Curated annotation (Swiss-Prot):
PROSITE patterns: CYTOCHROME_P450. It is an enzyme of class 1 (oxidoreductase). This is Cytochrome P450 86A22. InterPro entries: Cyt_P450 (IPR001128), Cyt_P450_CS (IPR017972), Cyt_P450_E_grp-I (IPR002401), Cyt_P450_sf (IPR036396). GO terms for biological process: long-chain fatty-acyl-CoA metabolic process. Its cofactor is heme. The chain crosses the membrane at residues 8-24. Keywords: Heme, Iron, Membrane, Metal-binding, Monooxygenase, Oxidoreductase, Transmembrane, Transmembrane helix. GO terms for cellular component: membrane. Fatty acyl-CoA omega-hydroxylase essential for the production of omega-hydroxy fatty acids and the biosynthesis of triacylglycerol-/diacylglycerol-based estolide polyesters in the stigma. Substrate preference is 16:0-CoA > 18:1-CoA > 18:0-CoA. Its EC number is 1.14.14.129. It comes from Petunia hybrida.
Length: 553
């Protein structure tokens, strides 16, 4: 009996090892992460949890842009746990465009986000997604929405963001710039989404119930990704752990949004009787002939907030960090800003600071757009994304992807591969986005630069994002010089969005434009008349300054 049991165990182990050898041999990328029996590549995943995106990039470099791995190497479960990881632009075009219908968000993604986002555009596939996409696309192409974004952004910059930075400058206190940017973009996106300002960016940096509840709901939702589906569903059913926080937070979000929608219905009714007009996204949907349920309208607004809030603020955080350590790039950005303001606002620099740049001025900032794009190439706001495989398929590089498996396309890695961006791919060089004469912004292939997604799901708010980021960046750099506070370490936070782990603590000092105006004068942009020095201090023009082509300098 004992002998037969032993032989049976040996036979089972031998059969498993033969199966394991077969499946690992069939996988693309033998130089990828080490595969272990039963646990697959999970040990490597855990070991590199604090440098996940770099670990994925290292594996992709070793495997020429694509590899396959399995989180759980158990027969009958392996296919579902098989993940194809790629950053090859040819593969990305195939997944995101050519065979778009074969690679939806998939059931896992939708189950995780359903409680928060329902069947909103961010979380849906098929006809549901297509209907919302077409409806939203009509709104995003209107000049009215862009003008509304310009108003919300500039109002927040002038009345809140700049005063907070100026106060920090006067007091000599460092600020967590990432936190300020998150508050700023949250207020802006709420204003644009449903016309209500939560005012999270105020001098006292208050806690807002809706913002806090939305953040907690998002965090709890993302936590579902790191555990098997049956585990978080069981915790939800039993009311355990973060599922309790998620449920409570969703109630707060729902109450807030219900109040917003009911109030807006009354306001739109009053508008028909001569009341004020609203141009936010929610109002524009409510004015349509189609009758949308309140739940649908709520999901429209929440999807828009989730898609537009963290992405812009995170990109700006990495931008200011990169620019603060690259004085050459900072100088070129300032030369561009000052040159344009001299043309549009005249010769007195004090007038440059009275109002933030309007979007006609922002549109001309080509080098600034290049610097922001270069930031997103190296530090994309969403570093990794995934798709579900409907039917067996072959990627352009020959990789077989079976039905039921998943594909992760690494946006972070795409920007860091020599075979895609050249030997200098790890350098911060905005010039790679400019034409040879340096005057025009050059649009890159969307499958090499996937920060805004690509194909039918390409980001509808791309132009609005650039408008917001350029407006904020120009306002800050024109007034202040930023430097990372001594002792503060900038690290990536491992989440779906590429936050800085401990924020971005920076010292704020006055911007001295003297070298910038001298640079402009040297290259013949403006003419010098006489002179001393100029220092912008708290937005106040200092007396005793020189004039450069009439520009106080």
């Amino acid at each position: 009996m004992e002998v037969s049991t032993t032989m049976m165990i040996v036979a089972i182990v031998a059969a498993y090892l033969l199966w394991f050898k077969s499946i690992t041999k069939s996988m693309k990328g033998p130089k990828g992460p080490t595969m272990w029996p039963v646990v697959g590549s999970l040990p490597g995943l855990i070991e590199n949890g604090n440098r996940m995106h770099e670990w994925i990039a290292d594996n992709l470099r070793a495997c020429s842009g694509t590899y396959q791995t399995c989180i759980c190497a158990i027969p009958f479960l392996a296919r579902k746990q098989l993940v194809t990881v790629t950053c090859d632009p040819k593969n990305l075009e195939h997944i995101l465009k050519v065979r778009f219908d074969n690679y939806p968000k998939g059931p896992t993604w939708q189950a995780v986000f359903h409680d928060l986002l329902g069947e909103g555009i961010f979380n849906s596939d098929g006809d549901t997604w297509l209907f919302q996409r077409k409806t939203a696309a009509l709104e995003f192409t209107t000049r009215t929405l862009r003008q509304a974004m310009g108003r919300w952004v500039n109002r927040a910059i002038k009345n809140r963001f700049c005063p907070i930075l100026e106060m920090a400058q006067v007091q000599g206190k460092p600020v967590d710039l990432q936190d300020l940017l998150l508050r700023l973009t949250f207020d802006n996106i709420c204003g644009l989404a449903f016309g209500k300002d939560p005012e999270t960016l105020s001098p006292e940096l208050p806690e807002n119930n809706f913002a806090t509840s939305f953040d907690r709901a998002t965090e709890a939702t993302l936590h579902r990704f790191i555990m098997p589906e049956f585990v978080w569903k069981l915790k939800k059913m039993l009311g355990l752990g973060l599922e309790v926080s998620l449920n409570n937070s969703l109630k707060q979000v729902d109450n807030y949004m219900t109040d917003v929608i009911n109030t807006r219905k009354l306001e739109l009714l009053n508008h028909q009787n001569g009341g004020p007009q609203h141009d936010d996204l929610l109002s524009r949907f409510m004015k349509k002939k189609e009758s949308y349920s309140d739940k649908f309208l709520q999901h429209v607004a929440l999807n828009f907030i989730l898609a537009g809030r963290d992405t812009s603020s995170v990109a700006l955080s990495w931008f200011f960090w990169l620019v603060s350590s690259n004085p050459r790039v900072e100088e070129k950005i300032l030369v561009e800003i000052c040159t344009i303001l001299a043309e549009t606002r005249g010769n007195d620099t004090s007038k440059w600071l009275e109002e933030p740049l309007v979007f006609e001025e922002v549109d001309q900032l080509m080098y600034l757009k290049a610097a922001l794009s270069e930031t997103l190439r190296l530090y994309p706001s969403v570093p990794e994304d995934s798709k579900h495989v409907i039917s067996d398929d072959y990627l352009p590089d020959g990789t077989f992807v079976p039905a039921g498996s998943n594909i992760t396309y690494s946006i972070y890695s795409t920007g860091r591969m020599k075979f895609i961006w050249g030997e200098d791919c790890l350098e911060f060089k905005p010039e790679r986005w400019m034409s040879q004469d340096g005057d025009k912004f050059q649009v890159q292939d969307t499958f090499r630069f996937v920060a805004f997604n690509a194909g039918p799901r390409i980001c509808l708010g791309k132009d609005l994002a650039y408008l917001q980021m350029k407006s904020i960046a120009a306002a800050v750099l024109l007034r202040h010089r930023l430097a990372v506070a001594p002792g503060h370490k900038v690290e990536q936070k491992m989440s779906l969005t590429l936050f800085m782990k401990d924020g971005l603590v920076m010292n704020v000092t006055p911007r001295d434009l003297t070298p910038i105006l001298a640079k402009i004068e040297k290259f013949g942009k403006v003419e010098s008349c006489a002179g001393e020095h100029h220092l912008i201090n708290n937005g106040i023009h200092q007396p005793g300054s020189i004039a450069v082509n009439g520009i106080a300098a």
